[in-house]
Amino acid sequence: MELLKNNKRIFPLIGAIIVFILSFSVLYMGDNIGLSDNGDFRRVLLVNNMEYENDSNYYYLFKQDYKMKVEGAGFWDKITYLCESNSEEDIYSSPQFIIIKASKVMNFVANKITSRDETTYNIAYLAFIYILMLSTAAWGIFTFFADEPRKMQIAVFLIFIFIFCDAGYLLYFNSLYGEPLQYVSLMILIALGLLIYKRPTIPKIACFFVALYFFAGSKLANVPYSVIVSVLALSFAYLRKGRLYRIGVLICVILAAVCITNLYMSIPSW
């Protein structure tokens, strides 16, 4: 007990683990739950070389399983193909596709281990990544409050659990919509912003702008706001002295602005 009281790293870690377990339980303890397809999934599926499990689209019904195209002579050739986009359908780009491709690789490896059809895609692996990202954000937020009195830490933990782990948010994790990436990347931005304010370092600032890029690309309507945030983030340069540090902040801001602007330029006419 004394160790728990004195070690400031324990409670953020325990809190993040609880967030992970609770979020996973909400989605997969009992009947699997998620959001139905309103017709938007097809566009995402085509770009990522995926398709519905059968000929019936089942719009407005939640679907757990899909099919992914797998091509290649060997294991690594297939992994490489899973990370590629459909050039014929690549009409827009989004960092959401990075998360989807990662979940495809996880599905493929799991299918190999369990001797299942290698083309089977279970959306639970996508939800797993989102839950992991949310838990990481929780860890960052809890770490920021690690120096506060225990009552404050418990209050922050309970607020996070009852507000940000609500089933209404978590349901989106079992879908191909952009909202779950928007949600978890925003939470990571908040966590990193707090940690940067407390102890500014270039790695944290670089991660902040990576999260901002994911937030911008999760919903293209976020792009203009993200450009503004990237410019305002120049204020990070005043949180710590040092020429190299400030140059690093400036480089991060410029790179983020360029990448986010490129996202804006890629917005299709529709």
PLM regions and their residue ranges:
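Hydrophobic transmembrane helix bundles of membrane-integrated enzymes that assemble
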Residues: M1-D31, Q96-W270
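Extracytoplasmic loop-helix module adjacent to an early transmembrane segment
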Residues: S25-F108
